[in-house]
Amino acid sequence: PDYALAHAVKGLSALMLGRRELVEVAAQANRTAQTCLQAGAATARERLWCAALDAWLRGHPSVAIARMEDALLLNPADTISMKLSHGIRFIIGDNHGMRRSVERVMHAHTEDHPLRGYALGCLAFGMEETGNYAEAERMGLQGLETALDDAWGLHAVTHVYDMTHRTK
């Protein structure tokens, strides 16, 4: 109950769903997260996630993205921070930012990284959204080899098939 990051995750997850009725859920999570931050020591990553939630609730999703990018500067292998940056960029329509953000951290998602497949799925989606269909397909299929349940990677590959008129 005193872990600020858990409350930030709850709030950011509620906002990602894009439902008006969940804004109050996010706001309550933010209030609790801020109280937790004041009560004890928090890591830099934890503070950044809380700052991202607070910024988005104040109407600044771009600032929330910037805080996730700050978290990635601390640890480029932080796949969940990468996915959150990617997701908020998707919501605001920043297709080139989606691609660049993932490209910046792929060096840390090496072959032995347990979440590499999901990172490849995000990379594939960013590539597809910026018109690089051949590379998007290659990255998406490669990601699906290790993350069979990655709906986002599968979504990226199906977008490629649709955009290249290969729907059969």
Descriptions of predicted regions:
Residues 2-6, 44, 78-79, 112, ...:
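Residue-level recognition of tetratricopeptide repeat
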Residues 10, 51, 85, 123, ...:
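Structural register within alpha-helical repeat arrays
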Residues 32-46, 73-75, 106-116:
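Flexible helix-coil transition and linker loops at the boundaries of alpha-helical arrays
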Residues 31-34, 69, 103, 141:
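Alpha-solenoid helical repeat scaffolds
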Residues 101-168:
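Internal metal/ion-chelating core segments
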Residues 65-69, 75-78, 83-89:
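Asp-box/WD-like beta-propeller blade repeats and closely related beta-sheet repeat scaffolds
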Residues 1-46, 50-62, 88-100, 129-133, ...:
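Inter-helical turn/loop elements of alpha-helical hairpins
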